């Protein structure tokens, strides 16, 4: 754990940045360099977030650093004077809708008041239930990627499935760890040439990266099935096999593979709970179905002192996260009278626009989650567990959704306890939203305090930790 983890109970700063991934690090660096007092809080033991995930010293010694540029960025952030609070989970917002409530690594209560709040909380992996998804040996691609990077071999024989460009590098990372990847199953048809894929020619570096993954998979004899999804994972005590079917024709079996590792995920969805608690207006993204904060191009939310950056603003990859973090910081500096270089802001805007072009291309090539997730949820067999924490089946959710008032997601949660367990709907949220009846009412899982499980002592202690005005 970092040395700089101990924090007094009430903290103030010019800017509080929540999340030390690429977006939060970039924002914090820019703000601190301009002379602002910046607090950077992250629940992980080390700063870096998902992309620059910093393994502990033993792992670094054993397998090396697969993204050393992340370590260099963290070092620059520290050198700029940012107060880094690792192991600090922001779990809520006080009644003033301004003071952040956090818990230290030891579970002590910490209040944070800042003139600006930058939410850089990243993304969740998008999971969709299927029969057998609760079996040991079934994991998300992000977890498989992280464990592989840390030298852990999660299985001997794997299938990687779901949708999105992330599946290919994950399959390659597994191969590097000596896992025999028998197949990649992609729900869409992104690798079949068509009018949309012509757009890829405008991004030669990305095309070359894709080609290198494809070549590695081909060398290892990995089949890439398109229009294919996981219908069922089989096994008694852990996953032993997987049945893959056509996405466009669920009755058609594509293959059944014996595996001891199944990695399934449908991309990423923004982690926007903190901005919602801070009162930021949100919209439903028509393409992804995700709840996203309403933002200016520089990440300013409807609450003027709150900015949302990186994947929390919409999944778009690490380079965009870095650029969004900087853009928000420059905007904050401009509004605080420390006018940053105009040319710099213009260059950043152009860079962001070019990155947005690639995000649009990706969205055009892979199936839109707003259609994919409900289609998968509709075909779920009744006894499939949707909420693994509270053991609620698809049939139970459907019955609650069909009852009076069932178009309301909170009513479905209340009637079934789905989404009310330890993970607070982080896993089953998209499926719950997709299974509801539609119609009036709240169609999204609400953001609720606490954002993470925390010791009761951290809440009780709050009464003794008065906030300070900023
Ligand atoms: C599991 C997973 C694995 C991924 N692996 C890759 C990969 O290998 N390659 C790739 O290109 N992309 C990967 N991504 C996508 C990745 O999120 C982005 O490319 C990039 O890391 C986004 O940067 P960010 O700063 O927006 O968010 P992140 O890097 O996700 O950083 C967000 C940080 O916020 C912290 N945080 C969130 N909520 C709180 C809270 N309430 N209190 C305190 N701290 C909080 C998190 O601990 C995290 O460190 C992965 C995503 C996930 C979810």
In which residue ranges do the predicted regions lie?
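Residues forming the flavin
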Residues: 2-416, 420-422, 426-470
């Amino acid at each position: 754990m970092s040395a700089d983890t101990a924090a007094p109970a009430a903290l103030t700063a010019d800017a509080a940045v929540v999340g030390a991934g690429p977006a939060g690090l970039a924002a914090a660096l820019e703000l601190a360099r301009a002379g602002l007092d910046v607090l950077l809080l992250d629940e992980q033991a080390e700063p870096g977030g998902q992309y620059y995930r910093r393994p502990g010293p033993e792992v670094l010694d054993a397998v090396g650093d697969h993204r050393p540029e992340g370590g260099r960025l963290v070092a620059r952030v520290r050198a700029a004077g940012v107060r880094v609070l690792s192991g600090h989970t922001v779990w809520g917002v006080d009644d003033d809708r301004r003071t952040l409530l956090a818990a230290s690594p030891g579970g002590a209560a910490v209040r944070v008041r800042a003139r600006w709040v930058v939410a850089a909380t990243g993304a969740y992996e998008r999971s969709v239930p299927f029969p057998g998804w609760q079996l040991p040996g079934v994991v998300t691609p992000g977890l498989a990627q992280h464990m592989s990077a840390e030298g852990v071999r999660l299985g001997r024989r794997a299938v990687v499935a779901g949708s999105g460009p992330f599946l290919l590098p994950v399959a390659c990372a597994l191969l590097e760890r000596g896992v025999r990847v028998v197949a990649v199953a992609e729900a869409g048809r992104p690798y079949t040439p068509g009018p949309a894929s012509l757009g890829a020619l405008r991004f030669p570096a990305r095309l070359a990266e894709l080609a290198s993954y494809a070549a590695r998979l081909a060398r290892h004899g990995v089949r890439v099935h398109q229009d294919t999804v996981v219908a069922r994972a089989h096994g008694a005590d852990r996953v032993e096999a997987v049945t893959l079917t056509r996405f466009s024709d669920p009755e058609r079996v594509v293959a059944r593979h014996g595996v001891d590792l199944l990695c399934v995920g449908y991309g990423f969805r923004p982690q926007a709970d903190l901005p919602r608690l801070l009162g930021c207006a949100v919209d439903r993204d028509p393409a992804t179905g995700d709840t996203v904060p309403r933002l200016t191009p520089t990440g300013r939310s409807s609450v003027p002192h709150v900015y949302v950056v990186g994947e929390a603003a919409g999944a778009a990859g690490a380079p965009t996260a870095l650029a969004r973090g900087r853009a928000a910081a420059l905007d904050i500096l401009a509004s605080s009278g420390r006018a940053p270089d105009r040319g710099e802001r213009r260059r950043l805007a152009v860079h962001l626009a070019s990155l947005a072009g690639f995000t649009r291309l990706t969205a055009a090539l892979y199936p839109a989650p707003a259609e994919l997730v409900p289609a998968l949820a509709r075909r779920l067999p009744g006894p499939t567990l949707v909420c693994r924490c509270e053991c609620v089946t698809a049939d139970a959710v459907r019955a609650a959704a069909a009852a009076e008032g069932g178009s309301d997601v909170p009513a479905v949660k209340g009637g079934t306890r789905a989404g009310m367990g330890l993970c607070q709907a982080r896993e089953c949220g998209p499926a719950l939203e997709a299974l509801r009846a539609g119609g009036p009412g709240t169609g999204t899982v609400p953001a609720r305090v606490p954002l993470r499980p925390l010791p009761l002592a951290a809440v009780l202690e709050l009464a003794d930790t008065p906030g300070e005005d900023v």
